[in-house]
Amino acid sequence: MSDLPLVPLLGLSGLAIEVLEIGPQPDVPGRYGALAAHGQVRVTAVAPAAEHTAPLLARGVARVVPVFLGDGGPAKLHVTRDPGLSGLLEPDPAVIDLFITLSTGPGGNFQTVFTTDVQTARLDDVLPDVAPDLITLDIQGGEHAALAHGAGRLASATVIEAATGFIALYKGQKLLGDLQVLLRDHGFVLHKLLDVEGRGILPLSPPDQRDPISQLLCGQAVFVRDFAALDRYGDDQLLKAAVVLNDVYHSFDLALLLLAEHDKRRGTAYAAAFHAALQTAPALHPQFLTLKSTP
């Protein structure tokens, strides 16, 4: 949670933020949880596993759409021994088996237990009525395909957090560079990387098997609507983006810029109040780039 939450500081209790969570954890909200705890968000989740619907609704998700996102055509679901690694892309043993603690072999976390045919749906087709402010995605290499068919949902969004790969652990996987190009064409810029993970390369066998040594594997990429072109933000988008960026992602510098633009347009005084609070805050904890801690 932010050091200086904007909603109570600026009296924005009536501001509602729409979140689209694609590939959610059934029992734990994403980083936006601090906002959700204060009733500031309405969450729509896309979660194809039927057993996830009840726990998602129980933790406050307003609506669950049980579909696989893609191009609207048939696909194959690869179910792995570690369920969290399952997805529509096939694990690539030529890459995975190079790394310490990762394996597609018998008993390995990426071992394919079975495959099954599924039908995908296009994001814009299944959620034409949702105008998200924040989109989060974690669907094992399928993030690019989901967003490529969701231009209508991207039109309202100001912040996107997507799981991304730096090296292809799945066959045909789109990587960070591909995602960056796609989102650039929709007016977004890469803002920061969080929970970056790596692994050592075999045959080295260090004492701490899960610690990274040299190779980037994956992480969470946060994109924002281009803040060098503030005319592309609506007035409400400026406020909502400022709240999300400050309260969820600790980007208080960018939040201040967006508030200043809102003040210029609407005659409010949010930026001055926030700037004064920043100047007197006992400690601030920016998140520029973070490594994922491993047990």
What is the role of each PLM region?
Residues 1-295:
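Phosphate/nucleotide-binding beta-alpha loop and adjacent structural elements of enzyme active sites
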